[in-house]
């Protein structure tokens, strides 16, 4: 697969010392090669700002934005301002993604009818066992905008 098109992965960071390393490592290990990871420190009072700086020192694909706390949407918007990718992926800092997620997204975007790509979400117990698989949207199906909204309403699936 060609890696010409860059994906910007924006990660708002706030009070996630325990989860941040797993999240960032899942992003840096992507099989799709042309990514930038934008960690937006949203004024986190713990060690997250220093952790973000260390990730940037270790990998030049990592950009850091340090800002005053403004909430999730404000942090995402701050990341979007410095993003240089043609596509944007938002990942919450207490989450992680499969190693081939970006590659699969890029393959899915080859369908000329695609405006948005929705990934699956699985809740995990502290012991690592799967708790709930959140996706009722069927894989590999192209929905119209109206069909997607109807499906999301039926499944009670709305994500920030």
Enumerate the predicted regions with their spans:
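Short aromatic/hydrophobic "clamp" motif used to bind/position activated sugar donors
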Residues: 88
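N-proximal low-complexity "stem/linker" segments adjacent to membrane-targeting elements
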Residues: 1-29
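Glycine-rich, basic loop-to-helix element that forms the pyrophosphate-binding segment
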Residues: 67-83
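Donor-binding/catalytic cores of nucleotide-activated saccharide
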Residues: 93-160
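A conserved acidic beta->alpha catalytic loop
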Residues: 26, 41-50
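Structural signature of beta-strand start/N-cap positions in the alpha/beta core
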Residues: 8, 34-36, 60-63, 115
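Acidic helix N-cap motif at the loop->helix transition within catalytic regions
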Residues: 21, 46-54, 66, 78, ...
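Short beta-strand/loop segment that forms part of the nucleotide-sugar
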Residues: 34-43, 63-68, 92-93
């Amino acid at each position: 697969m060609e890696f010409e098109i860059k994906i910007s992965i924006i990660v708002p960071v706030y009070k996630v010392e325990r989860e941040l390393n797993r999240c960032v490592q899942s992003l840096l290990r992507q099989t799709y090669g042309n990514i930038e990871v934008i960690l937006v420190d949203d004024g986190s009072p713990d060690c997250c700002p220093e952790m973000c700086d260390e990730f940037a020192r270790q990998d030049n694909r990592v950009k850091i934005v340090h800002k005053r706390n403004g909430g999730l949407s404000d942090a995402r918007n701050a990341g979007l301002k410095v993003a240089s990718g043609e596509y944007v992926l938002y990942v919450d800092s207490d989450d992680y993604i499969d190693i081939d997620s970006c590659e699969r997204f890029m393959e899915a975007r080859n369908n000329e009818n695609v405006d948005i790509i929705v990934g699956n979400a699985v809740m995990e117990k502290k012991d690592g066992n799967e708790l709930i698989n959140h996706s009722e949207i069927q894989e590999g199906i192209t929905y119209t905008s109206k069909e997607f909204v109807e499906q999301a309403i039926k499944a009670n699936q709305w994500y920030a």
